[in-house]
Structure formats: C-alpha cells, structure tokens
C-alpha cells in the first residue's frame, strides 16, 4: 500500500508537448513539455538544414506518445523511443529523442528545485573552459581577430584563415566584422571549391604566425572539417607538432574509424572527432582503441543528457575527454544544458562556444555567464533557459542549408 501511494505521489503526468520552429537569424527547433502541475521543460532538436524533418518526427510520432506519461521516468521514455522505433539511431531520430530527454531533465531539476548540474552530481570544476572562433581572410586579419579574443579572456582559441588562391575556405565569415554563419538561406546549398594541396601548403604558416606573435599561453585549436584523406591528415598532423595544438578536429571523415589508426601512427597532434555522431555506437571503436583524444558529440544529436552521459562515462575509461560541438546552429537551449553537463562531467576537456546574436538571445532568455575564458550555467532550477513563444512566432522558418564542397575539377567532396 505504502509503495503504491509513494509511486502515485511521484507521478508527474505530461499533459502537453509542443514543437516550435523559429528563425531569429537562423533556424531552431524547440520542444516544450508541460506537466499537469504546470512545470515546463525545454529541449533543443535543431538539425542544421534538416530542421523540418526533426520537427515532424517529434510532432507526428513522439509528442502524442508523451501525453499521459510520468515525466520523472526519463530513462524509460528514452528507451521507449530508442528501442520502440525499431529503426534505431540516425540524426533525425536521435535529435528528436535528445530534445525529449533534455526537456525531461529540465523538468526534473525544476521539480527538485536545483540547477541541473547539481542533480547530475554537482560541480566538478569552478567554471567551464570554452573556446572561441577566430578567422581572417589573410593571416594579418586572423592575428587581429585572435588578439581581440585574447583580450576578452579566452584561454582556448580556434584559428581558421582564408587560403591564397582559393575563393572560399571553411570557417570564413561572409564579410569583415560579420559573425561566421555557415548556412546560406535559400532553397539550394552554396557550392564551395576546395584544394587540399593549397591548404596543406598554407595552414602551417598560420599556426607559425600565431605562435610567433602570441606565444603558447592559449590553447590553439583548428578544424579540418573532414577535408583530408587519412594519409594527408597524418602528414599534416606531423608537420604541425611544433605548434603544440590543443587538437586538430575532424581531420578525415569518421565513418571509417579504422583509418584513424594510420593518423595515430604518424603524429602525436591530439585528435578531436564526433560532432556529426548521434550515438555511443558511432564513438565506440575510436574511444576503445584510443584513436582520438576528445569526443565532440552533442546533447542535441547524441541522445540528450542520458545519451551523452553514457558516452562520457565510456570515454573516461580510456582517458578520452569531452570537447562538445557548440556552434550557433545548436540553440541556446542546448548551450544551457551543455554548460550544466560540462560543469559536472568528470572527464571534461573544453566546450565550443560560438556565441549568439542579441536577436537569438531575446527569443531564448538565458542565465549563463562568461568570465575570463570560463562559463557558468547559473543557479536557476532546471536548465536556466527560457523561450519567448510570442517573439519566436515573429521569426518564421526560412529554408537554409549548409554548403557543399567540390574539388577544383568539380568532384563533390566533403564539406
């Protein structure tokens, strides 16, 4: 009898699950779950260039099956939507599950009246080290941008740069002083040209210039964005060892995890991989064979708090640390959740922080703070993030796509 009563009292029935697609500068997909006692939770389901697919997956399939369930039963709901779909994994399915999971953790932490990081096990550090993006169309521009971010207090800085002889290069803003936004609005992706030879010849010159001017005080990061073959990546990693990079990111497409062994055999430059992964299975071989140093999976794409916690725990056995993807195409809801996760997770490495426009942050009033290179999620119960539905409605969805890349002879390549 007592047991039944206790179960009944702990039941927090879900009465509403709503999906919002809004474009305050770029598209975001937000899930809002409401319980019968009025507690709400938010989850991010944004999948850049495929937002409507995740929105319909949630609206048509998951939201109706959430109604009447106990919001406290996060693990059971996660398993139900993962195993119950029969078709497991994949970016659309996992982004939808991630949003549900994030919203339920928001609710649970609010019900417990504590910030999410406390519910996860409390802070493991004073603050969350974040890295910023710096770019320039020339080395001098990149150095100026680096200096600006250094003055802001960033301890970890990613550098990208325009390459002589190439009209387009990954990581460039559309114009001087503009924030970098990879997606282009319209019905068709932008096509960009790529030359591995020009990249391999030029990029070490950028790192040399940065280290010569600024020294080794900051962690230096660089994103290769899946562009190189394994042997090219091995050669590149070897050639930049003197610059003591914090990591080289996504050196080669990671579907073939075996090929990272070849890179490892040739260079001690640390490797970070995983922003396009959507489950622990994508990470398994890379982690257990110690072929990478940082795992970049995200809360929005890899199963929410529940999925990411498994990945991080597994990675900790092999001294692989987290370095979660954090561009502005994951919404402020994901960033809020990520900062709670990062503050708690024992094997934390670094968190990417690209930042958001004022317009975006008006739609998603946030509670996190930045101080001298470190962020903190704040002490509000739950994720500490809100969603202004009325304002969001003023920014309807606009089709936008990430670019595609072609080699100079026209061959479609990895963007």
Swiss-Prot record:
BP-aspect Gene Ontology terms: amino acid catabolic process; carbohydrate catabolic process
Pfam families assigned to the protein according to its UniProt record, in alphabetical order: MR_MLE_C, MR_MLE_N
Binding sites annotated in the UniProt record for Mg(2+): 223, 249-250, 275
Free-text cofactor note: Binds 1 Mg(2+) ion per subunit.
Residues at which substrate binds: 48, 133, 275, 296, 325, 329, 352
Sites annotated Important for activity and substrate specificity: 327
Bilayer-crossing regions: none
Co-factor requirement: Mg(2+)
Record field: catalytic activity: D-mannonate = 2-dehydro-3-deoxy-D-gluconate + H2O
EC number: 4.2.1.-, 4.2.1.8
GO molecular function: magnesium ion binding; mannonate dehydratase activity
Keywords, ordered alphabetically: Lyase, Magnesium, Metal-binding
Entry similarity comment: Belongs to the mandelate racemase/muconate lactonizing enzyme family. GalD subfamily.
NCBIfam families per the UniProt record, alphabetical: ManoateDhtManD (NF043051), PRK15072.1 (NF011654)
Task of the protein: Has low D-mannonate dehydratase activity (in vitro), suggesting that this is not a physiological substrate and that it has no significant role in D-mannonate degradation in vivo. Has no detectable activity with a panel of 70 other acid sugars (in vitro).
PANTHER family with a match to the protein in the record: D-GALACTONATE DEHYDRATASE-RELATED, STARVATION-SENSING PROTEIN RSPA
Protein name, entry field: D-galactonate dehydratase family member RspA
